[in-house]
Regions:
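Short loop/turn microsegments at loop-to-beta-strand junctions
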Residues: 194-196, 222
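Short, surface-exposed loop/turn motifs with a glycine/proline- and acidic-biased composition
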Residues: 211-246
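Beta-strand signatures of extracellular beta-sandwich domains
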Residues: 113-115, 196-200
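Compositionally biased Ser/Thr/Gly- and acidic/asparagine-rich
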Residues: 1-176, 184-187
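Extracellular and select intracellular beta-sandwich modules with Ser/Thr-enriched
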Residues: 248-252
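Short, glycine-anchored, charge-dense loop/turn motifs used at functional sites
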Residues: 174-176, 180, 199-207, 239
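Short beta-strand edge segments in extracellular beta-sheet folds
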Residues: 254-258
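Solvent-exposed serine/threonine-rich low-complexity stretches and specific carbohydrate-binding patches
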Residues: 126-129, 208-215
Length: 258
């Protein structure tokens, strides 16, 4: 942790996470005199994972850094900031409890919150709220963010992040419709899901499967070129398309004109 002399020259928030058996006990964000907004000696790599692991880490590809980081300490010259983090797990089960420990004082009037992207929850870490993650999975990273700064910035940043994340599953109307020769089918996922998108004819027979795989949370689109699973063009008429996950199923109608 920081030495006392360092505390007076900045601040850190240490984030730990565990399931009672496995955990990642030291990850830090913060600002420090002498640190920069790019990779420097205060930014440390995440240790390699074992067969069973809990890893809270940060990726900074915009810095040209390929490896994951366990600490991201930035310049004192900037007051507002967002630290995006990922929870990755392997061969372990949740729930996972998140705890924070602040070292040094934030600038007067500043606040720090933890944002859970999946649950759309905002936690003010000064209030010692219980933070529990229940929906982490091995297939995808679980995204959270630490947002620190003046209240107006923190509120706006959290709102902006959440506005990009769907609140519910949705299958949208294809476009164009009617179509020839191809159309786009879009859908929204509020969490990572194993997704199946299929086309059916008017008799309910499967024509082609467009997606049968995991997709991350967010907005997605897939194109149908009017062909069946053998690559043959299908005839003019009404067809149905479906989105199915473990938690959701919806069907909509489309029309192919030639």
């Amino acid at each position: 942790l920081l030495k006392e002399a360092d505390v007076n020259a900045g601040w850190q928030i240490v984030i730990s996470i565990d399931n009672g058996e496995y955990g990642d006990i030291y990850n830090a964000i913060g600002r420090k005199t002498g640190a920069s907004e790019q990779l420097d000696i205060w930014d440390n790599p995440e240790p390699p994972a074992l067969d069973q692991y809990v890893s809270l880490n940060m990726t900074r590809k915009e810095w040209g850094v390929k490896s994951m980081l366990t600490t991201d300490i930035r310049s004192m010259d900037i007051i507002n900031g967002i630290w995006d983090m990922n929870l990755d797990i392997g061969n372990v089960q949740g729930p996972f409890t998140v705890s924070t420990d602040q070292i040094g004082s934030l600038p007067e009037g500043h606040v720090a919150v933890l944002l859970d992207h999946i649950e759309h929850q905002i936690y003010d870490i000064s209030k010692n709220q219980e933070i529990v993650i229940t929906k982490a999975m091995e297939e995808f990273s679980y995204p959270i963010s630490m947002i620190v700064g003046v209240p107006a910035f923190v509120e706006a940043a959290a709102k902006n992040i959440l506005s990009t994340i769907p609140e519910k599953f949705a299958l949208h109307q294809n476009f164009p419709n009617p179509f020839n020769p191809s159309t786009h089918i879009s859908f929204s996922l509020p969490k990572p899901s194993n997704v199946e998108v299929k086309i059916y004819n008017i008799l309910g027979q499967s024509v082609v499967t467009l997606i049968n795989d995991w997709r991350n949370l967010g907005h997605h689109s897939v194109q149908w070129n009017g062909r069946d699973k053998w690559g043959e063009s299908v005839g003019t008429g009404i067809y149905f398309y479906s989105l199915e996950t473990a938690d959701f199923r919806q069907v909509k109608k489309l029309m192919l004109l030639k």
